[in-house]
Regions:
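Flexible nucleotide-interacting loop at or near the entrance of a catalytic core
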Residues: 110-170
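Active-site residues of response regulator receiver
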Residues: 56, 84, 241
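Conserved post-Walker A coupling segment in P-loop NTPases
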Residues: 154-219, 230-246, 311-316, 364
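The feature encodes the CheY-like receiver
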Residues: 18, 60, 84, 88, ...
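Acidic catalytic/metal-coordinating carboxylates
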Residues: 36-37, 63-66
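Nucleotide-binding/hydrolysis machinery
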Residues: 111, 115-119, 188-191, 266-276, ...
Length: 394
């Protein structure tokens, strides 16, 4: 913590927000200046440099992301806190890639913002790692709910990293989407992303699926097979439902994570690989460890960074946007015009508990696109198992 009073500057075109932040920072005994545009801030930096900068993303003239890029070259040790009302995954990742100290979606708790300024002022500086922009299309992720914003922030913080990640959450919450986004915003973005649902393959076949086999390794092994680890070399391997893996395969997986090498089934030569592993589960792995169903050492290897995907019932404010997005996607698949929802239908779907989470919602939009007559979906078009009032004769 610096011995002098912290000097925090604010850039935001919202006068009321500037006033609230200035007041809170001054009450915390900090010095502050505020600017309506990034260009005005850059002029002021010729005279003085603050300890911390708070900037909005979308402003007239230069954006907050463009400002970050400018500051990264000229003032690499200046901690920047990015605030935005347009809080999506792309903005979060762009902010962290640009070197932001933290990303704070609006509306935010003013005390949290003041605490972040204190933390940022204690930085020793440091230059963020360069990360290549992904060449592939980014996985579609939608969410304004606080729980989803935390997911976006976690992905943004990990941009530039190849750390092992454990994604937890109920079935259908989009764990593979999170894994793809982590890959797309990592240094491995231009390398393979290989996904495998370990619970969908019989245990006796999973070993060969993961590690491959040599010709003649077992009955029916007529040729050499390259496994998923080799396919993912240089890139990312996503292992879904890791909690269902047999003890024997857990041991083999642990060795790969520890030594970055493995043997094909029936093979004699060790094969070196460079693979980032992202695992996912809908189980409580800590409990599975206590019950001796999951190796404790493997659990700690996988649980380096954890991201939890929230169930849809905990992010009801996102349901209208999700419905609109996936209704449009379903219409595109069918080659038809997108359907909309009337107010009663929207209310029915927004209050529905969605036990199958986003996966169930996606399937529901396809179903409604096919079965609902006309271009506007009413509550009468929605089946009762989705919270609607569809008559049994429809």
């Amino acid at each position: 913590m610096p011995k002098h009073s912290i000097n925090a500057w604010i850039v935001d075109d919202d006068q009321s927000l500037r006033w609230v932040l200035e007041k809170a920072l001054k009450q915390a005994e900090m010095e502050t200046r505020s600017f309506e545009r990034a260009e005005h801030l850059l002029e002021a930096l010729g005279e003085d440099v603050p300890d911390v900068l708070i900037t909005d993303v979308r402003m007239p003239g230069m954006s907050g992301i463009a400002l970050l890029d400018r500051l990264r070259g000229s003032y690499p040790d200046l901690p920047v806190i990015v605030i935005t009302a347009h809080s999506d995954l792309e903005n979060a990742v762009a902010a962290y890639k640009g070197g932001a100290f933290e990303y704070l979606p609006k509306p935010f708790d003013i005390d949290e913002a003041v605490d972040l300024v204190r933390k940022a002022a204690g930085l020793n500086g440091g230059t963020p790692q360069d990360v290549d922009e992904p060449t592939g299309a980014m996985a579609s992720m939608i969410g304004q709910a606080p729980a989803m914003q935390e997911v976006f922030r976690s992905i943004g913080r990990l941009a530039g990293s190849s750390m092992t990640v454990l994604i937890t959450g109920e079935s259908g919450t989009g764990k593979e989407l999170v894994a793809r986004a982590l890959h797309d915003h990592s240094p491995r973005a231009n390398k393979p992303f290989v996904a495998l649902n370990t619970s969908a393959i019989a245990s006796e076949l999973l070993e060969s699926e993961l590690f491959g086999h040599e010709r003649g390794a077992f009955t029916g092994a007529d040729s050499r097979r390259i496994g998923r680890f080799e396919q993912a070399d240089g890139g990312t391997l996503f292992l879904d439902e890791i909690g269902d893996m047999s003890p024997e395969l857990q041991t083999r997986l642990l060795r790969v994570l520890a030594e970055s090498e493995f043997y094909r089934v029936g093979g004699q030569a060790a094969i070196k690989v460079d693979v980032r592993v992202i695992a996912a589960t809908n189980q409580d792995l800590a409990r599975a460890v206590k019950e001796s169903r999951f190796r404790e050492d493997l659990y700690h290897r996988l649980n380096v960074i954890r991201i939890n995907t929230p169930p849809l019932r905990q992010r009801q404010e996102d349901i209208p946007q999700l419905l609109q997005h996936y209704l449009a996607e379903a219409a595109q698949e069918l080659g038809s015009s997108p359907k909309s929802l009337d107010a009663e239908a929207m209310e029915a779907l927004q209050t529905f508990k969605w036990p199958g989470n986003v996966r169930q919602l996606v399937n529901a939009t396809r179903r409604l696109t096919v079965t609902a007559p006309g271009t506007v979906i009413s509550a009468q078009d929605i089946p009762s198992d989705l919270g609607g009032t569809e008559s049994s004769q429809q």
